[in-house]
């Protein structure tokens, strides 16, 4: 399906176009319409009109049914979504078919279920100065709370997991009764356009969901986040972009929810199951060629097993096949610049560090080698800055306290993994790691009901389950004297 805006219940392709490039072989495969300021404004006004026409007052039953129709619509076009995801990102088809698209379907179904049975507290309060006289009531007041939608929500999603992370925000926003204006990454417009088609066929009122394509600075992203008609902003992407959006949001004191970058550590203790820790670290470093915010970029290994682990990790990295490209030539060049910088800073290259040769059209694509490095100081830029590619730096530690100091010495704090057979150590270490998520003897094992998000420069707020529903709605206290 050709990329198109979806505004007020209609598809449109007006606006200048920019190229859509296949990262696998570098070919131009399509054009994407660039939203003008007017199109963004029309999308926000369409969303506001949908709220005023009654969407914000619909009951949970109607909203849950709409979410389930959307989930069913994605399921019915499953292969089409997989094809679009692979075409935009170049990721392995198996990853799209087993993670991205099923999780997107699951997001809508999960929030349909969560709409029922949310507990709300009620309190009775004594009325000051009350006396028991005829007609004076009970001398008490009943306080209870209800939640209402925020209004028009701007959702800006990234290119690495384009459908999954778009639906991760759209589903709870719609569940809470908001109207949405979404802007996907300019690199990955296809699954977002397909989602708009599914929502259109699901019969939601015109304007409840709107989609605009375009870039960020002085373009659709900036115009949307500065728009006075937007009541909240939810964004996943780079920390620097999050800071820019926060400045835009400050003009109107617009609430924000951010899931930003990470420089995630793995702590591997000598008592860990070596093979399990190795398998898990290969996954956490190199899945989707490291282009997942949760991927590991810093690996700390207890000294007794350090040399063995480094050798095994390097061997596994060299043996990897079937991995995907970087999303763009620009991002490939950024990752390669970090590879060169690491060597300049004194790194030892255990595996990778360059560009692979395939002998086919992929040689024109945006690939880099899975890379394992050692020998850098903790002050090195590659150890401090997010690369967002298939690279990790491995360093030794001697004590539990040193491992924690190394893990926490970062401007980021999204996720961490801990590998140990010692259950007491796991319970002791996990709360001391300064991240929003800690996995013990696993990686990226997710439950949609749990809080998801980071600390420091990795984000503001939490997503998932009731945490998302709380962000996308506001509590109203009602006090009735009885």
Q: Model-predicted segments: where are they?
A:
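Short, structured beta/alpha segment
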Residues: 1-87
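A structural signal for short, well-ordered beta-strand elements
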Residues: 19, 33, 56, 213, ...
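Conserved C-terminal structural/oligomerization subdomain of aldehyde/semialdehyde dehydrogenase
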Residues: 25-31, 230, 267, 360-482
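Residue-level signal for inorganic ion chemistry
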Residues: 26, 63, 85, 177, ...
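Structural signal for hydrophobic packing residues in well-ordered secondary-structure cores
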Residues: 51, 55, 71-78, 82, ...
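N-terminal Rossmann NAD(P)-binding subdomain characteristic of aldehyde/semialdehyde dehydrogenases
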Residues: 56-57, 65-166, 210
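Rossmann-like NAD(P) dinucleotide-binding subdomain of oxidoreductase/dehydrogenase enzymes
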Residues: 120-276, 397
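ALDH superfamily catalytic-core signature
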Residues: 232, 240-377, 440
